[in-house]
Curated annotation (Swiss-Prot):
Protein name, as recorded: Fimbrial protein PrsE
Gene Ontology cellular-component annotations: extracellular region; pilus
Gene: prsE
Pfam families: Fimbrial
GO biological process: cell adhesion involved in single-species biofilm formation
Signal sequence interval, chain numbering: 1-24
Keywords, ordered alphabetically: Cell adhesion, Fimbrium, Secreted, Signal
Length: 173
């Protein structure tokens, strides 16, 4: 019996070392991508009606507040908005068909809101946190302000209708 026991250990050890190694390969893959969806922004219009040219203030006057309605399926974290307009930069939109060769023309200045009204200027192409957000998720509403001004010489402005567009994108982060 001692002889069998003595052989048992080397035989078992040899069997373990010589046996094929069984290894389970990863054969299930789980993947996807988590996203935070952008808000769906409704069209908004700011209409100044008739403005007398001589009443324009170069740095911006004729203030109008306006709201932008949106549907935000995700509303955790902080809302950020970005406003762009035909590749323009700075804090104003040069209204098409009102500018001269020297760059003079009608400007629209955009401002954020705060608890007491008008806030800081909005820089086109940069993210900003809206100062006033109302509504309950998913229906949200932000308040912004617009002012009319001009660049250059007031005499270069021509009477007539004007129109400009911009794109607002909103999401939470």
């Amino acid at each position: 019996m001692k002889k069998i026991r003595g052989l048992c250990l080397p035989v078992m050890l040899g069997a373990v070392l010589m046996s094929q190694h069984v290894h389970a390969a990863d054969n299930l893959t789980f993947k996807g991508k988590l996203i935070i969806p952008a808000c769906t922004v409704q069209n908004a219009e700011v209409n100044w009606g008739d403005i007398e040219i001589q009443n324009l203030v170069q740095s911006g006057g004729n203030q109008k507040d306006f709201t932008v309605d949106m549907n935000c399926p995700y509303s955790l974290g902080t809302m950020k908005v970005t406003i762009t307009s035909n590749g323009q930069t700075g804090n104003s939109i040069l209204v098409p068909n009102t500018s001269t060769a020297s760059g003079d023309g009608l400007l629209i200045y955009l401002y954020n809101s705060n608890n007491s009204g008008i806030g800081n200027a909005v820089t086109l192409g940069s993210q900003v946190t809206p100062g006033k957000i109302t509504g309950t998720a998913p229906a949200r509403k932000i308040t912004l302000y617009a002012k009319l001004g001009y660049k250059g010489n007031m005499q270069s402005l021509q009477a007539g209708t004007f129109s400009a567009t911009a794109t607002l994108v909103a999401s939470y982060s």
